Amino acid sequence: MPMYEDRIDLYGADGKLLEEDVPLEAISPLKNPTIANLVSDVKRSVAVNLAGIEGSLRKAALGGKSNFIPGREVELPIVENAEAIAEKVKKLVQTSEDDDTNIRLINNGQQILVQVPTTRMGVAADYTVSALVTGAAVVQAIIDEFDVDMFDANAVKTAVMGRYPQTVDFTGANLSTLLGPPVLLEGLGYGLRNIMANHVVAITRKNTLNASALSSILEQTAMFETGDAVGAFERMHLLGLAYQGLNANNLLFDLVKENGKGTVGTVIASLVERAVEDGVVKVAREMNSGYKVYEPADWALWNAYAATGLLAATIVNVGAARAAQGVASTVLYYNDILEYETGLPGVDFGRAMGTAVGFSFFSHSIYGGGGPGIFHGNHVVTRHSKGFALPCVAAAMCLDAGTQMFSVEKTSGLIGSVYSEIDYFREPIVNVAKGAAEVKDQL
């Protein structure tokens, strides 16, 4: 029997019904098989850039930006022999013939997706085993395939794994993981939040609602890891994932469609009207001036509605400008206006608005060190909202028309090419709905 009475209808990115009368817990990371598979694949997947390795060796461009070692050039036809290398990597990585190791060639052998077996993940203390094992296997596979001698073997290692272990990360490497090294996390349990918005956008091929959905899934699943979504707060996070992330009851789609030619303010008006109609909030009292003070019938559901309105306002505002830079101020002033309009707390009970203050400063104010797309939930500036701010950033970068110095194409080309080949990464909304359909009658 479900723990919560909430039941939702799940709609797709096109506003069409996918699954109806779904228990809220069916979209929980603890119950939904699609989310479980997605998180597992995030941890065990590595993108290897064979074309990059070949180019690094040919130019002796090793260990990162501006590093060249004349005289150490090595000519190896790596892409041409991608299939043989992939087969060798598989034999080195797998633990048995029938395990779930997965090796996939992409772009005619220019890249490889390596998914290490869950048996290796199970005996590791953290998720970096996927990058370390894959890197070591690719190095050995190239050495074996081309009979590289002991004098050039270290160049192969550096072309594959970069400066590691001289650095704590893989600076200058030609392999990428979605999760950064644990030593760079802002706090315990922040691993799933350490995926920049541009990566999410590239993986979903700039589909706005799927990008915000994937971001929401990663952010809200992290809340279960950090202990935020436990006990009294679990329902709040599940409702946030359902409505803001997965377009429950088509609320997100309806708000965007209704305000296609509107503003942040009109989205707020639509949201409050919908919340009153659905019985989420009610007028507590009316002042002599006519100002209405609202009170929620359900605090957690109000937060989910407010978060959905926040994402809708971002889509409307940034979509009108076709420039992602406005996302920070949209997150800030949507909440500011919403609080004045209703007398109720903003999204995430103030944390989203607080996050936006710092986000505005560090993304384009006096400091302006980085565009919105390079931020993530593990960033010191944007970590403070408990899963409700970053989906807006992902949506904004989908709608950007090339205004950013840190564009999706520049920062996330390899990640997008490799991970977008996995359907539940590329289209999470429909696949999570399928997962919910599998388990809803078992709850």
Curated annotation (Swiss-Prot):
Gene Ontology terms for molecular function: coenzyme-B sulfoethylthiotransferase activity
Needed cofactors: coenzyme F430
Cofactor note text: Binds 2 coenzyme F430 non-covalently per MCR complex. Coenzyme F430 is a yellow nickel porphinoid.
Pfam families: MCR_beta, MCR_beta_N
Record's keyword annotation contains Transferase: yes
Sequence positions that bind coenzyme M: 367
Role according to the record: Component of the methyl-coenzyme M reductase (MCR) I that catalyzes the reductive cleavage of methyl-coenzyme M (CoM-S-CH3 or 2-(methylthio)ethanesulfonate) using coenzyme B (CoB or 7-mercaptoheptanoylthreonine phosphate) as reductant which results in the production of methane and the mixed heterodisulfide of CoB and CoM (CoM-S-S-CoB). This is the final step in methanogenesis.
Protein's UniProt name: Methyl-coenzyme M reductase II subunit beta
This protein's encoding gene: mrtB
